[in-house]
């Protein structure tokens, strides 16, 4: 009977149990797991088989640790072995983690066209997740996306749009959920595609800052927001078939190199530090002057950050701009469609394109402010 392992956590119950499509078997006396969904066989060692069978019997984690101790495995090693197995099985979809969270530890947020419900089993997790969003909205209303997060030992588990369970360290919760939501929102928009671009508005018209991670999109976005631009997103922008641009207005993500500028522009702000999967330490700054809805791009800026030198704008023709945009585009199915190509063509035809070479974000800010105010 696959009852699951139950661990009492304050007023909630956390249940670890084999996934419904995962089965345990012996082949030539060797323990294996078969996943019907993934169509794969996973071989277990004897210790892994012991832990799996105990969880399948409904043993608590405390019981698993204790019975491993009876096999002369010290407690810290028993915990490590058990969690190594749980982590691997969760990632492989072999183990389900289920829980119930009180609705009193929750909030709703607006992200572009979406209203997101977030619940967590403690205030620290909730605070970390709240730092992701610019617009919190706790009025009654229908949510189209739900995120739940739960802390078990030192692991955080969360579930969202796809119903699957995902895990991360507590310091990585907000960046991991942001990456998860971004990927799912891109995949849910089958008709469009996305660009690695920050998006802003100046007097109702759009500015795209294009560049791969590390090009300085977020730092320059911080500068332009301080100059009075409206914020629409700092990382990814969705492009519709009509060429309309729609950013994902998560709170502005700032890596450690931008914190000095952040403290100068927002001296009273004191945010939580988070750790991304790539090891980067980041902080999130909610932007109040946020643009809601789509934009028509009037300026396309390709960022070229260098170690030193004077900031310079160089005009690009439509062909060069198109090639660069295609290099930075990605779609849900991995292909840029003909409709996507013509959407890019509409954007390029209606916008002025430039390469911005710069080393200091303040100099780049001045050039872009002049450009967007028709002074360049």
For each predicted feature, which ranges?
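Walker A (P-loop) phosphate-binding loop of P-loop NTPases
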Residues: 213-214
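Charged, amphipathic alpha-helical linker segments immediately N-terminal to NTP-binding catalytic cores
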Residues: 135, 139-186, 361, 368-370, ...
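Long, charge-rich, low-complexity alpha-helical segments
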Residues: 37-113
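Pre-Walker A adenine-sensing motif
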Residues: 185-202
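Conserved lysine of the Walker
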Residues: 217
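Glycine-rich, often acidic-flanked micro-motifs
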Residues: 14, 27, 198, 202-210, ...
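Acidic, low-complexity/disordered tracts enriched in E/D and polar residues
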Residues: 1-49, 53
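Post-Walker A alpha-helix
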Residues: 220-221
């Amino acid at each position: 009977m696959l009852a699951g392992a139950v661990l009492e956590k304050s007023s909630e119950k956390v249940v670890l149990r084999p996934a419904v499509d995962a089965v345990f078997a012996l082949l030539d006396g060797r323990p294996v797991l078969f996943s019907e969904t993934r169509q794969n066989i996973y071989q277990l060692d004897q210790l892994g088989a012991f832990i799996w069978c105990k969880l399948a019997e409904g043993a608590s984690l405390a019981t698993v640790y204790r019975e491993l101790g009876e096999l002369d495995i010290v407690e810290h090693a028993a915990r490590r072995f058990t969690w190594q197995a749980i982590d691997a099985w969760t990632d492989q979809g072999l183990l389900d983690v289920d829980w119930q969270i009180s609705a009193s530890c929750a909030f709703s947020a607006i992200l572009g066209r979406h209203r997101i419900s977030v619940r967590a089993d403690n205030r620290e997790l909730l605070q970390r997740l709240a730092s992701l969003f610019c617009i919190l909205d706790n009025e009654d209303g229908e949510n189209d996306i739900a995120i739940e997060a739960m802390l078990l030992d030192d692991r955080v588990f969360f579930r969202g749009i796809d119903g699957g369970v995902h895990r991360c360290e507590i310091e990585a919760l907000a960046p991991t959920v942001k990456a998860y939501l971004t990927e799912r929102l891109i995949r849910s928009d089958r008709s469009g595609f996305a660009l690695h671009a920050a998006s802003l508005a100046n007097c109702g018209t759009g500015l795209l800052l294009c560049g791969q991670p590390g090009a300085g999109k977020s730092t320059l976005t911080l500068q332009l927001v301080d100059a009075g631009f409206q914020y629409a997103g700092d990382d990814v922008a969705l492009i519709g078939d009509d060429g309309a641009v729609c950013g994902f207005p998560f709170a502005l993500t700032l890596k450690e190199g931008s914190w000095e500028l952040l403290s100068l522009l927002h001296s009273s702000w004191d945010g939580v530090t988070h750790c991304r999967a790539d090891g980067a330490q980041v902080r999130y700054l909610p932007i109040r002057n946020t643009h809601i809805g789509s934009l028509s791009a009037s300026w396309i800026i390709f960022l070229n950050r260098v170690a030193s030198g004077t900031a310079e704008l160089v005009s690009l023709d439509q062909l060069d701009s198109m090639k660069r945009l295609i290099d930075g585009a990605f779609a849900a199915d991995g292909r840029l469609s003909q409709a996507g190509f013509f959407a890019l063509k509409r954007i390029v035809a209606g916008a002025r394109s430039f390469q911005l070479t710069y080393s200091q974000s303040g100099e780049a800010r001045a050039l872009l402010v002049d450009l967007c105010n028709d002074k360049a």
